[in-house]
Amino acid sequence: MTQSLPSIFIDNGNCEIQPYVSLADMTTFRVGGAAEWFIAPHNLKELQASYAWANEQALPITFLGAGSNLLISDQGLPGLVISTRYLRQRTFDPETCQVTAYAGESLPKLAWQAAKRGWSGLEWAVGIPGTVGGALVMNAGAHGGCTADVLTEVHALDKDGTVQVLKPEHMAFQYRSSILQQSPKPVLLGVFQLHANQSAEQVKATTQSHLDHRLSTQPYDWPSCGSVFRNPLPRTAGWLIEQSGLKGYSLGGAQVAQKHANFILNSGNATATDIFNLIHYVQQKVEENWSLLLKPEVKMLGKFPQIT
């Protein structure tokens, strides 16, 4: 990648695509290289224009929400990175108890706004440091609830730029997975069916309880991506890692958290390669001890070292 390229303006000059933009501060791990091209659209029109431009140039496209559950290579990402950080809008329909939220909307904020209205269904989402778009792609969940439980429809872009409406039966939801991982499409918004079957105080109390539990059991002192591995039910990844004696283990600037072993921390000077190598080391040790290969929940983007 080169740092000397000028910005490109599309959509009659209204939409700026910038070259060589660092992505590290846009991820919760605080690591990673630069985007070859980058844009943070302020509305759906700019999103559609930038998406069309990248397709015309035959560039790879990466969508970036809150940057949680994500590890970006130190070498950065080729093509266009589209950040949804400005695509934040939500509407609550009191007649249907449905919530419509844009892809960049904060999941915890959405959960709290629903709770204040006494609408149940999103209490589980309060401690997940992600966006609506990421939740739809990953089928995010916690505390026994998940995105699939409340989803009514997803609006996404086809490659030709037309809006496609996906119903739950089109989403192929599984544990931390959806069709949008196998066949990626830009997510515009999601519509969620909630329920006004409790008082606002009850819903807020449950929401606060979930948040308190998360804060008391998970590390927040250093940057991380959230849970690194999927839970191989009925066991948990954290328990297997802890029983393998890996709590506190470090490689470079990456460390297995003492508070919760399914978290890897950037202890201050980690690189993406440090974190990648520690993920692989944890997998090796757990497999040696338990004959079970932990599957990463964190999504890895870009080029990483070959594992032999």
From Swiss-Prot:
Which GO CC terms are listed, alphabetically? cytosol
Q: Which cofactor does it need?
A: FAD
Task: List its EC numbers.
Answer: 1.3.1.98
Please name the pathway: Cell wall biogenesis; peptidoglycan biosynthesis
Family matches, as PANTHER family: UDP-N-ACETYLENOLPYRUVOYLGLUCOSAMINE REDUCTASE
List the GO molecular function terms. Answer: FAD binding; UDP-N-acetylmuramate dehydrogenase activity
Please tell me the species this chain comes from. Answer: Acaryochloris marina (strain MBIC 11017)
Q: Which reaction does it catalyse?
A: UDP-N-acetyl-alpha-D-muramate + NADP(+) = UDP-N-acetyl-3-O-(1-carboxyvinyl)-alpha-D-glucosamine + NADPH + H(+)
Q: Which Pfam families match?
A: FAD_binding_4 (PF01565), MurB_C (PF02873)
Residues of the active site: R176, S227 (proton donor), E297
The protein's job, in short, is: Cell wall formation.
Localization, UniProt? Cytoplasm
The molecule here is called UDP-N-acetylenolpyruvoylglucosamine reductase
In the record, the note on similarity to other proteins reads: Belongs to the MurB family.
Q: Does the keyword Transferase apply?
A: no
* Organism phylogeny: Bacteria, Bacillati, Cyanobacteriota, Cyanophyceae, Acaryochloridales
Entry keyword annotation includes Transport? no
